[in-house]
Amino acid sequence: MPEINLKSSNEEIVNTFFKDITCDDYQESIFKGGQSFADKALNNLDINGYAKKRNNVYPTEKRGSSYLSPYIRHGLLSLKEVWKHVDSFEYQDKTKFRDELLWQEFSRHLYAIVGSQNREFLNFYVQNDPNEVVENDKMNCISTVEQELESTGYMVNQTRMWYSSHQMFRTNQYWLESENYMYKHLVDGSRFAN
């Protein structure tokens, strides 16, 4: 492999050396990688109002998401340090936020126990009535969240849940196809936690 010129732009480096291993065209992420950016995100974390805003999807400025999940998922922030960081916030917000951290911890333990066997006993196929199947391309809400996922690598938790439910129960798509699609694009993708 030829030497990478670190003075080149990120786009030039990715397109020259890594284009064949990516699924999308190059674009700048809404997340900056590395420990210093993870630490900065944690230090700037403000969960005031989190409990009330947690399930907001749109408009984006009303979301309660912490946007820490990529840093947690890739090991730059530990659940323990994030847990401690929110200790001084109001009880309701702190409790709701910590519930989400506990879900991450639970999913890690469950995955450690069952691994990929979850496909065998935790999931099932739903055969929908063909007359009730919804075509995604005719639904603005679906195309909007898919476009956001593909362009940012992120979906807020509430969107992940209703999108997954929609794909499972309102289309004839096998659940694993949707899981693979989301995992392919999510910068914080976790097959068990998501």
Regions found by a protein language model. Name each.
Residues S88, F169-N172, D188:
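Short, well-ordered loop/turn and helix-capping segments at boundaries between secondary-structure elements
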